[in-house]
Structures are given as structure tokens and as C-alpha cells.
Amino acid sequence: RSSDLWVGTERELRINDIGYEYATSAGEGVTVLSNEFLTGGVTLGARFAFRERIARLPDREVSLGTKWPVLSVNAFRSFTGLWEGELETWRVNASIDKVFHIRLFGDLSLRLMGGVADPNAPYSYLYNLRGTNGGGTKEDPTLLLAADNTFQTMVANEFLADRYAAFHLKHSFGTLLVKGKHFKPRPGVVYNAGIGDLSAPLNHRGYSFTALKDPFLEAGVVVDNILSGVGVGAYYRHGPYAFADTNDNFVFKVTSSFTF
């Protein structure tokens, strides 16, 4: 079996200079707004992969995978006074990954992940659900590169949660459907779902966001490796957070897949 455990400590100053302010009560009728957060904390990480095969090279170790699910856990806890820290907060994340190699049908990759954070923490210590459809609004998407295990049609920072769960699925047919001498595209399908909640939305000022109380759903079709590791993907947003205009629910991206 293969298992890793690491513990660390850190001092970090986070400053938001693009309009966000964190609101705290300083007494009856008095609210204090802040955009600077100094923390001193302890980090803990663990990874467990049962019967993982490892190739040992002269300068590093390379994982050859395992037929069992891989569990990863990360936790953070800050303390007032540690490394002069001024904020006490915490959060815990976990994920389970599994790849099924299905003979004559391709590879099915699954990831189940989730997290819980201090409900009274500032914005940057919570979860934005990893939306990768641009950096601002749906009218002006700026990032058109697909990333696995993220939400392709969700605008960056569109949602905010202090607890969430997400499911990511990708099935790649490999070269089973089309295979030429030089042209070896890899068609596949993608499905992503997520849900969460936000306990104290009024603590966060200056940003426009939605608390993810209903399921966020999207489906996609990809063709990887059309040309030298580069492909294309088309994704469709549906469910409770679908836009009224059907065209706004479609997102097209470039995919990349390189083997080293």
C-alpha cells in the first residue's frame, strides 16, 4: 500500500483590493469591515492509495496507479497569536478518485469531493466551487481552456459555500471509435454536479455571488487529441441554475492532454 502524511505550519497575509469586505459585529448597531486577514495556522494532508504501484526513478518516484480508490484529505486550522495571526478559522477537504479501465469500452474516471469550512470565515477561506468559465460574467467569458474536475459552464466566483459536495465524471473512449495512422482523436463524455450551502451570506460585502443551495448540473462532449494533444469540448448547463436563454448555457473550450 502507499500512504503519505504531511504536517506543516504557515503564516499568511491575504489582502483583497478589488472591493471585497468582511463584516463583523462590534456591538449593537456597529459593524466592522475588513479586507486584510493575517493567519498563523497548521496544515495537515494525507493521501492513501491501497496497493498503488510505484516506479522508482533515480530522481523521483512515479505512480503507476492502483485499481482501488485513492483517498486524499487536507485540513487547515489557524490560531490567534500563532505567528502573530489575528484570525481563528478552519476548513477540511476530502476527495476520492477512481478510474475504471473497461475492456473494449475505454476509461471511466470518477471523483467525489467535498469540504466543510468555518461558516464565519472570510470569503477567501470558503469555497467558490471551481468554476472555470471565464473570470467575470457569462457575457464576457475569458478563459476557454477546459480543466478536469472543475465546472466548465460555471462562471468563476459565481457561487460561494461554506460546505459543499461535488461529483465529476469523465468517460473516454480512447481510440476505440476512430484510429488512424496519424489521426487518433479520443472522444468522450463529461458530467459534473455540485451542491452546497452558505450559512452567513450577510458577512460578505462588495462581491456578487449566489449561495449554492440547489444542485448545479452540467454535461459535456469532448474530443481530445485532435491535433498534438489538443482537442475541443462542448458543455451544457442545465437544472436549477440554467440560464433563461438556451444559448447562454452552452460553453465551448479547448482541451489539452499530453503524455510524458
Predicted regions and their residues:
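Exposed, low-structure sequence patches enriched in small/polar residues
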Residues: 1-260
